[in-house]
């Protein structure tokens, strides 16, 4: 606004005979009321109460209106009023205060002549705010309920060092974590927390595999330093050391029973050991590359080994000789599992395929499944028909064996998965990744999973990406299903609360 507009000369028709004392008194009342109102707003941060002017201010404004506006010539909102000009010239520092009072007056005028309208609007506004607060509270309560929901699996374990292998104790709630610096960490796990029991320094170089003996009293570890160690879990004392167990770095261990265990190294040598002897009781070199996994069935007559050179090699434990070696595959054979009552062997490969063999006939596969189309490095049998496979993509997927079917995602890691194991009762799956973390997945729900029929229709694309109950992610279909369920519940509630129709 220009200066000449602020200080223009009042017109004769705008002049009002008001004494200076009345003007000063009126301004003082407004200033005091605005100060009180500002203090109230600053102290309580309650903007809802500021919609209507306080009662003392209403009385002051009403008195001023009766005394000054009785002749009808005085309008506080008129910019051309000489009183406004005089007020601005008399007390410029209080312009903000007068402006605040004018806004409060305008709010009062908009509310109507009666204060009841203002109070009704306050009530409506408060009710609206309460409705919004109720919705917010429901959302917050839902989030809190999800956070406080009882855990079905232990929390994550995070280490500073790379985790090379994990193994569950056969009887107790203890898990062993082998690390790249040669240590083994023993954790007691529960759904509430994980507790570090002890750290055992076993090897000078990377500890590549860790296994518990059948009674759970000792740990068997192998290392890049070519040694095998047997350590008492409770006392941490070394019970036996095979300092040069292999000529090359040892990669895999397998406990056969209370007396025997097997080891395989990076050059393909497989050895059989007896806890009671100093040297190996059997050694065979039929593989030219790293032994990736070893397995046996309940009868423990045959020892099977997969290798990075694409062979499945079977040894006769009793006869201590080669049983059969498969035809070579143009891909790495990384992992395997036994299913269907020890009648089927399934092998996972670096190309994401799954080869199925009839037990005892390991020369060539009888079935080939497309798998997950990404390298499969780990496999854990969950039931007689269901396997969990994992690899470089960081996902743990469940597969149904014979007929083959992708069931969905069991769990996820942010980086490639390095090792997996399942506890004795088959309900808890653990996995470690290149992110130095161990995560747990409750897979008990597979016990109630029915058999799949060969001709059953399914969507392979959706099945592969479907998130199972143990997954940390949810399915979009579940989200929209919940929304539809909420809408149906709301409609039912509306129908229940609706009164009888008044139409005739």
From Swiss-Prot:
Protein name (Swiss-Prot/TrEMBL): WD repeat-containing protein 55 homolog
Highest rank taxon of the organism: Eukaryota
Organism: Drosophila willistoni (Fruit fly)
Pfam families, alphabetized: WDR55 (PF24796)
Keywords, in A-Z order: Repeat, WD repeat
Region described as Disordered: spans on this chain: 32-135, 484-504
Residues passing through the membrane, by range: none
Biased composition (Polar residues): 66-76, 114-124
Entry keyword annotation includes Cell division: no
Compositionally biased region (Acidic residues): 32-49, 77-95
Sequence similarity: Belongs to the WD repeat WDR55 family.
WD repeats, residue ranges: 158-197, 202-241, 245-283, 286-325, 328-367, 412-451
